[in-house]
């Protein structure tokens, strides 16, 4: 009787697990984040003074053969400070991505309702996509840009500025006006 019960239990386990083994084999590790962070909060300082703060509701890190990257699918917020630790710049986007290539190159991309504010100059810039060249300390886009300031309104295609949005230049302006 014990032998029949044991044989039945073994047969049941082998039969019930048989169809599920293929599911584990089909999992592609490149499509699954290796790290997930909820309510991410980063502060960058130099000599004890805050330079930058970044926040995101969710960060997902992925690893590939040629690069690793972090995705921020639920929004990304960056705050830049002056040397006197006064809040100067805000960058807000629906989504962002930070690419790190194995050869050492890096690229930050913000996309979807990107808003860049320089609070000191009272300038607001809106675009769909923004890139940050961290090595050269520049932000830029090739997309349509609107910029509001106390001096007027500008719009055009393509923009470049230092990373604090202090010196924004719109490359192909049109229908702009000054006050």
Predicted features along the sequence, with ranges:
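Mature-chain termini and adjacent capping regions
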Residues: 1-179
